[in-house]
């Protein structure tokens, strides 16, 4: 089965969607409540709004991330640091604008949005990389073939 078969694309989209929805719900809620000072209600609203957004952006993000990983492999080989840096850059550059819009849509003020997005970017230095590994794990669970 190649990456471009319908079945492979569906598996890839399902794995990417599952991974992004679960990961962003859990990590986002922790960041919003513990670091950003949002109320539980604001955070829950934000996380519920994020679900359909994450469903829409999950597969495009997976493809975007894969392009970063391929670029890193082409220019730095199989070094773990290059892969981790690619995961970090892909995650922060793709997710930060989306996250800011979600927070704005649920009524977070500019200070909360700035704090949450900046905190998320800082936390992503570890969490973006962790998400990359979680995504790989989900792709294995969904038996996605030839995804990178």
From Swiss-Prot:
<dbReference type="InterPro" id="IPR010574">
    <property type="entry name" value="Ala_export_AlaE"/>
</dbReference>
<keyword id="KW-0029">Amino-acid transport</keyword>
<dbReference type="GO" id="GO:0032973">
    <property type="term" value="P:amino acid export across plasma membrane"/>
</dbReference>
<comment type="function">
    <text>Exports L-alanine.</text>
</comment>
<keyword id="KW-0812">Transmembrane</keyword>
<comment type="similarity">
    <text>Belongs to the AlaE exporter family.</text>
</comment>
<dbReference type="Pfam" id="PF06610">
    <property type="entry name" value="AlaE"/>
</dbReference>
<dbReference type="GO" id="GO:0034639">
    <property type="term" value="F:L-amino acid efflux transmembrane transporter activity"/>
</dbReference>
<feature type="transmembrane region" description="Helical">
    <location>
        <begin position="49"/>
        <end position="69"/>
    </location>
</feature>
<keyword id="KW-0997">Cell inner membrane</keyword>
<dbReference type="GO" id="GO:0005886">
    <property type="term" value="C:plasma membrane"/>
</dbReference>
<feature type="transmembrane region" description="Helical">
    <location>
        <begin position="115"/>
        <end position="135"/>
    </location>
</feature>
<keyword id="KW-1133">Transmembrane helix</keyword>
<protein>
    <recommendedName>
        <fullName>L-alanine exporter AlaE</fullName>
    </recommendedName>
</protein>
<keyword id="KW-0472">Membrane</keyword>
<keyword id="KW-1003">Cell membrane</keyword>
<feature type="transmembrane region" description="Helical">
    <location>
        <begin position="18"/>
        <end position="38"/>
    </location>
</feature>
<keyword id="KW-0813">Transport</keyword>
<feature type="transmembrane region" description="Helical">
    <location>
        <begin position="88"/>
        <end position="108"/>
    </location>
</feature>
